[in-house]
């Protein structure tokens, strides 16, 4: 019965997706960032970029906005993952800090 084999196949591939990790980057040279679930990384990254596409926010505002968006659907510490992914996005030149006081975060203009 081939149906049983298909079921097992699907289960295994789902597991692999879930367990895939990404080594996040750190904006300061010589510092290493965390290795986290790729699925969680993708979810947090998408939300951070969506939030910052609307306006510049301070660190606190950004983390609060992120928490509001994912608190009902995210497993794990939202602030911890938010911070990890935010640093990674800075290291990849996708977001940047402003020179204003208080310091804010924004999307880098070069990105399409």
Feature-to-residue mapping (PLM):
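Short acidic, hydrophobic short linear motifs in intrinsically disordered regions
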Residues: 57-68
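Short amphipathic alpha-helical interaction patches enriched in hydrophobic/aromatic residues
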Residues: 52, 70-74, 93
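Short, positively charged loop/turn segments that connect secondary-structure elements
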Residues: 67-83
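Positively charged, polyanion-binding regions of nucleic-acid-associated proteins
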Residues: 38-56, 87
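A short, conserved structural fragment
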Residues: 90-98
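Short, cationic-aromatic polyanion-contact patches
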Residues: 100-112
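Long, low-complexity, charged/polar intrinsically disordered regions in eukaryotic proteins
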Residues: 5-43
């Amino acid at each position: 019965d081939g149906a049983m084999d298909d079921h097992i196949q699907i289960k295994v591939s789902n597991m692999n997706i879930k367990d895939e990790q990404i080594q996040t980057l750190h904006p300061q040279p010589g510092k290493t960032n965390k290795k986290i679930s790729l699925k969680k990384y993708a979810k947090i990254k998408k939300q951070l970029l969506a939030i910052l596409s609307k306006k510049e926010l301070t660190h606190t505002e950004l983390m609060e906005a992120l928490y509001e968006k994912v608190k009902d659907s995210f497993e794990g510490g939202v602030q911890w993952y938010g911070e990890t992914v935010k640093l990674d996005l800075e290291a990849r030149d996708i977001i940047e800090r402003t020179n204003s006081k208080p310091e804010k975060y924004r999307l880098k203009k070069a990105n399409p």
